Amino acid sequence: MKSAFKSEFPFEKRKAESERIVQKFHNRIPVICERGGKSDIPDIDKRKYLVPGDLTVGQFVYVIRKRIKLPAEKAIFIFVNDTLPPTAALMSSIYQHHKDKDGFLYVSYSSENTFGGAGPLLEK
């Protein structure tokens, strides 16, 4: 899925912003979170996050769920590079292995597991 954030801002601007963020907030990770293509979950009110490195993927999902006011009975899945990251993985580890060339970690969310299952996200 093509990121709307990437479409809106040129690479140089995104890279400069992520470098500034990482320099200013050493223990934070710059994350762009956008709704996946055909999801019926509402759009999120903001897509840029500064996430603590010691936050787990499961805790990040909780934050996203709260931001979009998703009822408990509705499922939500998040994807990094079209793969489900392990719930217990630290965001710092996911960032280390999967950050974009511009320095941001791109995460998409959906109401369906559209990519079929968890993959080897931490093996590289």
Swiss-Prot record:
Propeptide found at 117-124
The places in or outside the cell where this protein is found are:
Cytoplasmic vesicle, Cvt vesicle membrane; Cytoplasmic vesicle, Autophagosome membrane; Vacuole membrane
Gene Ontology BP terms: autophagy; protein transport
Lipid moiety (Phosphatidylethanolamine amidated glycine) attached at 116
Q: How does it sit in the membrane?
A: Lipid-anchor
* UniProt family annotation: Belongs to the ATG8 family.
Add the further remark from the entry.
Kluyveromyces marxianus proteins are shorter in length and have a more ordered secondary structure than their S.cerevisiae counterparts, which might contribute to the superior thermotolerance and solubility. K.marxianus could be therefore useful as a new model organism for further elucidation of the molecular details of autophagy.
Q: What is this protein called?
A: Autophagy-related protein 8
Q: Which organism is it from?
A: Kluyveromyces marxianus (strain DMKU3-1042 / BCC 29191 / NBRC 104275)
Name the lineage. Answer: Eukaryota, Fungi, Dikarya, Ascomycota, Saccharomycotina
